Amino acid sequence: MNRNVNPTPANGSAPTHGSAPTLRVFDLIIGLFVTVLIISNIASSAKIVDWGFSLLGVRMAFDAGTLLFPVSYIFGDILTEVYGYRRSRRVIWTGFICLALSSLVLWLVRVLPGEATWQDYAGQAAFVAILGGMSSGGIVLASLAGYWVGEFSNSVVLAKMKILTRGRWLWMRTIGSTIVGELVDTAVFIVVASLFHVFPWSLFVTLVLTNYLFKCGVEALMTPVTYAVVNWLKRVEKVDYYDYGTDFNPFVLR
């Protein structure tokens, strides 16, 4: 396997970068990542799901996007683990731009006049009630801010842990980075969304706790799947990147 950066150089010298590999699956993963990201954000605006029970006095309820959004962190783990932080950084920015673009398109649809028949059986009020969040400033800013901070936190933590663990204990890296990334993401998203009255402050603790615990739980349960996908990709792509000497500045796109 072509390890782009060898974690244990035989001669003790500084790790060096190998030749750029031909990536066969990378583009597909980008497409799936962006799809999951956009759908989960639309679902977050559309509905709040109630589990129907309480835990330690906290009602178990979360926005519907929470059902799918943890998968984006699994993709983030896979991207950083296999392809390294530098490629993941470009994917995170790609997702950010696509998410902003989808919000812009929904906003344009919202302000365009509705046809008479559509107004009768659906109407502007129904559109705004379900998709208004994705086309209004509050949910858009909350989504973009939470996503950006959370995904970069997740990727940086995983990349640095991979070096510290010398590539061992993948489960520790994926769960550990998710604990940090999801906490930052969830807190920022709920705070900003509540400031813009997307969610009532009365649900703040419930949404933060249930969203965070659910997302981390999904990551833990999906660890065997993550292992299988990571091992398969490393074998197919013939790459296993270690971020020695990487500039972790999110604004450096090279």
Q: What would you call each of these model-derived segments?
A:
Residues V34-D50:
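Alpha-helical transmembrane segments of multi-pass membrane proteins
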Residues V229-R254:
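Short, highly charged, low-complexity non-transmembrane loops/tails of multi-pass membrane proteins
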Residues V109-G138:
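Membrane-interface interhelical connector segments
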Residues G95-F96, L144, W148, W171-L183, ...:
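Transmembrane helix-bundle signature of multi-pass membrane transporters/permeases
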Residues L99-Q119, Y147-E151:
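Transmembrane alpha-helix/helix-exit interface in multi-pass inner-membrane proteins
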Residues H17-L32:
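N-terminal membrane topogenic signal
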Residues L67-I78:
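Central hydrophobic cores of alpha-helical transmembrane segments in multi-pass inner-membrane proteins
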Residues M161-T174:
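Membrane interface segments of multi-pass transport proteins and intramembrane proteases
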